[in-house]
Amino acid sequence: QRQMCIRDSRMYIANATGCSSIWGNSSPSTPYTVNAKGQGPAWGNSLFEDNAEYGYGMLLAQKAIRKRLKEEVEAVAASAEASEDVKAACQEYLDSFGCGIANGDASDKLVAALDGCDCDTCKDIVKNKDFLAKKSQWIFGGDGWAYDIGFGGVDHVLASGEDINIM
């Protein structure tokens, strides 16, 4: 029997306590799995009533970290000391910064190009490699959360206009 598996390594999931946490992450089985690199979705569970805000906070934190890393990549790309290979990897990363899967591939190339560089900026980028790729932020919850107790948060997140998914 074939089972559905969710294995997107760019997927960040905020889950409300309730029915979605039962089908979404109960022992001894889970719908989430890893890819060939051992990477899979990041799943977190919040209180029932604040899940929209929790997921939105995850998105804002990711955006802040990526903004700082983007500035570091721009500095490396502009450095006279950077090799042409490093500059090309930096440019590919910057060109695909908002493009999901393409940015994940560019992030891998960037880390490979910077691995072994001695400057503090390159070391920081490599150290934070898990935050380089654009993430796909999801907020999961049931009808009691979305239509009742958590509605104000859902409304706030949707009104933000951010690239976020609610299910």
Role assignments for model-derived ranges:
Residues 1, 115, 119-126, 132-137:
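Gly/Pro-rich turn-and-neighbor structural signature
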Residues 11-15, 135-149, 164-167:
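A short, small-residue-rich loop immediately preceding and capping a beta-strand
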Residues 7, 129-133, 138, 157-159:
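Solvent-exposed alpha-helices and their adjacent loops that cap or buttress functional pockets
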Residues 22-56, 130, 148-167:
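Catalytic or ion-translocation cores adjacent to nucleophile or general acid/base/metal-coordination motifs
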Residues 2-6:
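Short, small-residue-biased leader/transition segments that mark boundaries at the very start
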Residues 47-121:
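N-terminal leader/propeptide and maturation segments of large enzyme subunits in energy/redox metabolism
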Residues 110-117, 132, 163-166:
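Core nucleotidyl-transferase/polymerase catalytic module
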